[in-house]
Structures are given as structure tokens and as C-alpha cells.
A protein has these predicted regions:
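Extracellular glycan-recognition regions
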Residues: 1-202
């Protein structure tokens, strides 16, 4: 199902943005971020997130993010934002003229957990696929929108039947850049059930 961005709802809209039936453009505001406590010992919760609400417990969300990031920590990608202390984000985050961080942050009960891999700084777009199976989530990325590779499998303890999912972009430092999101689509869950070892009995 193709997603009409006009049906999505902002949590903290940025000062500059544009929404059409085909795409979303976000111009980030300086000093916007999502992070809770771990290592840095600060709580940042002011990044704009544009999301769709669903009670569907098995689905995949696909989007292409294009970004003109240029200052450390500039980032754009996908998110499942439940509240300040419980959320998931996956993005490309600018580091310097040589590398960016392709990574994900999972925050449960007010503590964030970041995992990343370095990619070339010349990359200016990325496809993301976010899949849900109940309270479990899988994030994948792709450079062509066809062949996806796993970034992370995680759990959100506070994910009820109804959740919100979508896109975000932010600039934690003194920066602003444009991120354009296209090809927003919700599909049947592409993350198939595990077919190996049987689950433990609860």
C-alpha cells in the first residue's frame, strides 16, 4: 500500500517542511536530536518525527531517504517513536568528509543503545525497510530499493498493539540540511517468522 504522507502526523514539526502526495521534505533545525542518557549523560528529545499510526502487528515499511548532510551528527532515516523513553530510529548519520554512520538506536525505558557501521561520506541516499512482528522489529537498508541487508533486530517493551512509525531528520549541532523522503510504502511483513530452533516454552 502506497502511503500518502498527508495522512501522517507530526511529533514536533520542523519550522520548514513540505508534504505532497509523493514525498516529504524536511529542513532540519539546529540542535535537534533523539537520545536518552547512555554514555553522553544527556536527554535530547526534540527531533521532528512524521508518523502513521497502525494496529497492524505484522507489516513492513519502506522509504527512500535522500540527504544533503554536512555537519557531524546530521541524520535522516526511519523511526518508531512511542514516547520520550521508548523508541527506535535507523539512519545515515554524517561524521566527517570521509565517513558516515549507518546505524540504529533502540531506546527502552529511557536508555539508548547505538550500533553502527561506517560507510563512505559520498553516499547521499539510502533505502530503509522497517518490519514489525508484534513487539519485535527488524531494520534493513538498501542502495537500490530491491536488495536489502539486515541492520538490526530489536525489541520495544512498550510497543502495544497500536504503534506509530515513520520518518525523521535532525541536526544535533549548529547545522541545518535538507532531507527528502520518497517511495513511502506499507506492505505485508517481509521479515519472515524464524524457521529454525523452536521457541522456549514460557
Amino acid at each position: 500500500m502506497k502511503i500518502n504522507p498527508s495522512d501522517m502526523v507530526w511529533t514536533r514539526p520542523p519550522r520548514q517542511y513540505h508534504i505532497s502526495q509523493e514525498n516529504v521534505t524536511i529542513v532540519t533545525d539546529p540542535h535537534t536530536d533523539l537520545w536518552q542518557r547512555t554514555y553522553y549523560h544527556f536527554r535530547n528529545d526534540n527531533a521532528p518525527v512524521l508518523q502513521l499510526e497502525t494496529a497492524e502487528e505484522y507489516f513492513s515499511f519502506v522509504v527512500r531517504a535522500q540527504f544533503d548532510s554536512k555537519v557531524r551528527f546530521d541524520q535522516a532515516g526511519v523511526a518508531v517513536y512511542l514516547d520520550s523513553d521508548n523508541w527506535l530510529k535507523a539512519s545515515v548519520e554524517y561524521e566527517n568528509e570521509h565517513i558516515q554512520r549507518l546505524g540504529s538506536v533502540v531506546t527502552n525505558n529511557g536508555y539508548s543503545d547505538w550500533a553502527s557501521v561506517d560507510i563512505d561520506a559520498s553516499i547521499k541516499y539510502m533505502w530503509f525497510r522497517l518490519s514489525r512482528r508484534g513487539q519485535d522489529f527488524c531494520v534493513e537498508n538498501s542502495t537500490d530499493g530491491v536488495h536489502f541487508g539486515q541492520m538490526r533486530i530489536c525489541h520495544l517493551f512498550n510497543a502495544g498493539q497500536s504503534i506509530r512509525f515513520g520518518i525523521y531528520a535532525c541536526s544535533p549541532e549548529e547545522s541545518s540540511f535538507e532531507a527528502v523522503f520518497t517511495h513511502l510504502e506499507m506492505t505485508d511483513c517481509k521479515w519472515l517468522a524464524h524457521d529454525g530452533q523452536a521457541p522456549d516454552e514460557e
